[in-house]
Amino acid sequence: MRAQDGRYSILELSDQGRRAGVIDVHRSLGVLADDPEGFVAAIADPAHRILTLTVSEVGYCRSARTGTLDVERDDVRSDIADPTHPRSTIGLIARGLAVRAASGAPITVLSCDNLQSNGRATRAVLTEFLHASAASGDVLNFVDNHVTFPNSMVDRIVPGTTAQTVADVAGLMHVDDRCPVPAEDFTMWVLEDHFAAGRPAWDRAGAIMSDEVEAYELVKLRLLNGSHSLIAYLGLLDGHPTIADAWAQGFVRDAVRTCIANEYLPSITLPRGFDVDVYVDSLSHRWANSALGHRTS
């Protein structure tokens, strides 16, 4: 991305065809392992108002057994012993906030990972770390009163980048993009509108600002993820290599729709104003998208 001045392309895949567009929002880039001090300084900089996280579940340093801070991890133990030279993601964020506390400038830490109640989980594990590493009362008060952790939910199928992705972008845009991102043409981003120092007008681009993020999460987990697994299991057993191939089978569609109606929907409370019929119809289109090449195995 450095060689491309922070630019990359999104390749949207659908059965109606492929289209590509350029994302040009990054103004500086860094590799955390190469420059942890730069990361800490960026968090501490009062000019920066939102820290977004896409670090995968392992980046939160949570125990798979308890959901709390995993103090058995080597990097976490090291950071607790010496919080001024952190190695873990949570340790680095904690250090950045500790330095920022001197200015008192509010900031939002926005998790965008597939983690239930991700904002609440991030706050909890970070607070645990601060206490374990003997953070000062000033730092603890700053995090309590001037740092917010909104819950959010992201829903978009993003396959891995392949040589075909690069070739498709080159054919559509006549550029040699070394880091394109393929994705389906469906997007849903739901966020709590709880930002400590303002936010961009993401809602104008389609983001849903809601105090019911957890309800949206359950819709995704049960209706999308649960059904997706059922399609994969039935499709694989019936000899179909992709989700789209499996969804084309009548018995698979019948089984999934029956589960949605009789098992999944009765187990959740829908968000206010949520049109479940429209959402289920969109799921059908997503599962039928053969351009994604999603495997059943």
PLM feature spans:
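Substrate/ligand-engaging "lid" and interaction regions
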Residues: M1-S297
